[in-house]
Amino acid sequence: MKLAITITLAILALCCSPASAEICQSFADIIQGLFLGTPASFEAAVEPFKPDADMKAATTQLKTLVDFLPKNTKDSILKLMDKIAKSPLCA
């Protein structure tokens, strides 16, 4: 469970690098699918990026881990991500 949270926050950190002034909408859709979508909808959101077999296996495993998180934990993570994305530190 902690692994899923750590990986997700690391992904978000990449999005808030000084090189990216705003979050790519596709990336935001993937994160939303990770936490709120079905496994099929999450796979569909990732598919346009043509992941190889290892990437697909990793994203499936991550989705499975996230799905085991309690709803209040997922909600809190999404709130934190939103707060980080809107922070002046990510501008």
Curated annotation (Swiss-Prot):
Listed A to Z, the keywords are: Disulfide bond, Phospholipase A2 inhibitor, Secreted, Signal
Its GO CC terms are: cytoplasm; extracellular space
Point out the signal peptide segment: 1-21
**Membrane-crossing residue ranges in chain numbering:** none
One Pfam family recorded for the sequence = Uteroglobin
Q: Where in the cell is it found?
A: Secreted
* PROSITE patterns noted in UniProt: SCGB
Task: Cite the GO molecular-function annotations of the record.
Answer: phospholipase A2 inhibitor activity
Q: In which tissues is it expressed?
A: Club cells (nonciliated cells of the surface epithelium of the pulmonary airways). Expressed in lung, uterus, and prostate.
GO biological process terms on file? signal transduction
Q: Which CDD domains match?
A: Secretoglobin (cd00633)
Q: Report the InterPro entries cross-referenced here.
A: Secretoglobin, Secretoglobin_1C-like, Secretoglobin_sf, Uteroglobin
Explain the purpose of this protein: Binds phosphatidylcholine, phosphatidylinositol, polychlorinated biphenyls (PCB) and weakly progesterone, potent inhibitor of phospholipase A2.
Summarize the subunit comment: Antiparallel homodimer; disulfide-linked. Interaction with LMBR1L is controversial.
Q: Which family does it belong to?
A: Belongs to the secretoglobin family.
- The name on file for this protein is Uteroglobin
Species of provenance: Equus caballus (Horse)
